[in-house]
Amino acid sequence: MQEIDGSYGEGGGQLLRTSVALAAITGQSVRVYNIRAKRSNPGLAPQHLTAVKAVAALCRARTEGMEVKSQEIIFRPGPLRGGEYDFPIGTAGSVTLVLQAALPVALACGEKVRMNISGGTDVRAAPPLDYFRYVLLPLVYSMGARAKIEVLLRGYYPRGGGKVVVDVEPCLPLRPVLLNASEGLEGITGFVHISNLPKHIIHRMANGALAELSTFPTPAVGLEVFGKDDAIGEGGAVLLTAHKEHSRLGASAVAERGVPAERLGAEAGRCLREEILSGATLDIHAADQVLIYLALASGVSCFLTRELSSHAATTIWLLEQFLPVRFQVTQEAHLIRVRAKPEFNGMSSFLWR
């Protein structure tokens, strides 16, 4: 049984989610203790509990310690199975953080998987669903994955209630991806959406983003606005995407009470501008989230990023505990090169259990 100290590195929920995902994929039992020990509210929150339950359902796992505020769980995976699953978070907890754990496992199931997830689609301290759909998923698609996400209803803090349907086809091992050279910018797209808020807010958010990008020598910026998204409660978000030949860079911001709409749009614009100017092939958030997929590929992958977050460093450590993969991180001028090298032949004997 793997023993994982949940306080290691960044010591947050991502370590827990990735631990149970890797346990399910590899068939290794795991005990995770000191869960979220570095947070002001340690232990399992509802969204963490739902993520673990989602992975447990996909592999018929036997579990212990599965309750809110629990700081230790034991996860004993069984056989991976496809089918249709319902994963209600019950709060405004993030849908994308549940997907962060469940999607890699669904790819390994050997059968089609449909996941009906309810919760928060656009909440702070988590990737907005549109970032997951339009920045991260295209990268995973390029590695051979096939998944489709449909938003039936958006959900915001504090009410949640968003509804998302995710269809996944099995496809492990993934193809490696080489994003090891800076590329020219082909264009910038994006969109802003709001629900149950005055229309002027959406235009102020869009104008804030455009103002940040207007002095940047890029191709034309195509920004769409949507003011009638079906949702539970009030909220909104902006997503900006820079398109390169083989990769995308993303930046986003989620509306919050008391923060001017222009400032939120400008925040996303500044972040995207910084990513573009750095010459990175993946933005700092994609660099964090793509690591598990690189570890499940059939060959060497690499990318360039402007910063390696504590989440990413912790995930690299964790992946090397579960999988025969080695990561190499090197500083190259103002960029960081990350290289993932799986050290097994084709994954078949290891993953298809």
Curated annotation (Swiss-Prot):
- What does the record list as coiled-coil region(s)? none
* Catalysed transformations (reactions): a 3'-end 3'-phospho-ribonucleotide-RNA + ATP = a 3'-end 2',3'-cyclophospho-ribonucleotide-RNA + AMP + diphosphate
Return one GO MF term: RNA-3'-phosphate cyclase activity
Q: Which PROSITE patterns match?
A: RTC
The EC code for this enzyme is 6.5.1.4
Which superkingdom is the protein from? Bacteria
Compartments where located: Cytoplasm
Tell me the InterPro entries matching this sequence: RNA3'-term_phos_cycl_insert, RNA3'_phos_cyclase_dom, RNA3'_phos_cyclase_dom_sf, RNA3'_term_phos_cyc, RNA3'_term_phos_cyc_type_1, RNA3'_term_phos_cycl-like_CS, RNA3'P_cycl/enolpyr_Trfase_a/b, RPTC_insert
Q: Which UniProt keywords apply?
A: ATP-binding, Cytoplasm, Ligase, Nucleotide-binding
Q: Which GO terms describe its biological process?
A: RNA processing
Q: Which residues does the annotation say bind ATP?
A: Q100, H285, A286, A287, D288, Q289
Q: Where is the active site?
A: H311
**PANTHER family documented for this protein:** RNA 3' TERMINAL PHOSPHATE CYCLASE, RNA 3'-TERMINAL PHOSPHATE CYCLASE
Role this protein plays: Catalyzes the conversion of 3'-phosphate to a 2',3'-cyclic phosphodiester at the end of RNA. The mechanism of action of the enzyme occurs in 3 steps: (A) adenylation of the enzyme by ATP; (B) transfer of adenylate to an RNA-N3'P to produce RNA-N3'PP5'A; (C) and attack of the adjacent 2'-hydroxyl on the 3'-phosphorus in the diester linkage to produce the cyclic end product. The biological role of this enzyme is unknown but it is likely to function in some aspects of cellular RNA processing.
Family that this chain belongs to: Belongs to the RNA 3'-terminal cyclase family. Type 1 subfamily.
Q: What is this protein called?
A: RNA 3'-terminal phosphate cyclase
In which organism is this protein found?
A: Nitrosospira multiformis (strain ATCC 25196 / NCIMB 11849 / C 71)
Q: Taxonomically, what lineage is the organism? A: Bacteria, Pseudomonadati, Pseudomonadota, Betaproteobacteria, Nitrosomonadales
User: What gene is it encoded by?
Assistant: rtcA
